[in-house]
Amino acid sequence: MLELLKKIGYTLYRIWFYILVALPILVFFPFLLLTTFSEKWYPAFFWLARNLWAKPILYGMGCPPKIVYEEKMERGKSYMLVANHTSMLDIMLMLYISKNPFVFVGKKELVKIPLFGFFYKRVCIMVDREDTKSRTAVYRRAQRRLNQGLSICIFPEGGVPDDESVVLDHFKDGAFKMAIAHDIPVVPMTFIDNKKRFSFTFFSGSPGPLRAKVHSFFDTTDLDGEGTAELREKVRAVILAELLAEQ
């Protein structure tokens, strides 16, 4: 009986999440749509997404963010934001942490998500990891967005591991190659509680604080392509050490 009640609770918690995701999009649809007509209006879209979508979801789920900053981002400067990826709340938490407008680079498959996918396609940089031409196009689009003063966000694991016992999967090169090519600092972040609060396993999750740590930045101005692997592993080591310390 107790197990059945738990499953009912988990199911209701999931349904509540999707209501919180959909409701602001429906209510503010005309304003969100208007800000996607031109790339120069993206900062307005970002403000709406951050303040009227991400924040209500996090607090509505009973997951108030608790952020520790070793270093803070400067207004008007571009960065490469990277973090571990274990939960659908990762997107909302990333939006909460950064006041600087940034653009997500993510899988094209997310376009299929109803309502969310409509805006994802219009404002994010989509990549087909199986298509070399797609990866090349990502660099061109990222360059254009960086020239507009925006930052870029990539989850360098390239997806969420099927095995939830994996603490942190291996990182792919893309985010670090891009940071080096464009001479922008890498901002490592550790999302400590997201997997516990709302993992991709259906019958799981619970309200509670979402702790995250923004680590000291990695400068890339003196690096070239040969430094990609070393930078990648240094950033991964910082995030992994924090995750292991909090287990």
Where would I find each of the regions flagged by the language model?
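N-terminal membrane-anchoring alpha-helices
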Residues: 1-64
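Non-catalytic C-terminal accessory region of glycerolipid acyltransferases
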Residues: 4-8, 137-247
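Catalytic core of membrane glycerolipid acyltransferases/transacylases, capturing the structured
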Residues: 28-48, 58-61, 74-132
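A generic structural signal for well-ordered alpha-helical segments
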Residues: 57-58, 120, 145, 179
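Short gly/ser/thr-rich secondary-structure transition/capping motifs
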Residues: 61-68, 135-136, 194-197
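Short acidic-hydrophobic, aromatic-tinged amphipathic segments that line or gate anion-handling sites
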Residues: 67, 125-128, 220
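Generic preference for hydrophobic
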Residues: 67, 81, 104, 154, ...
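A short beta-turn/loop motif at secondary-structure boundaries
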Residues: 71-75, 204-205
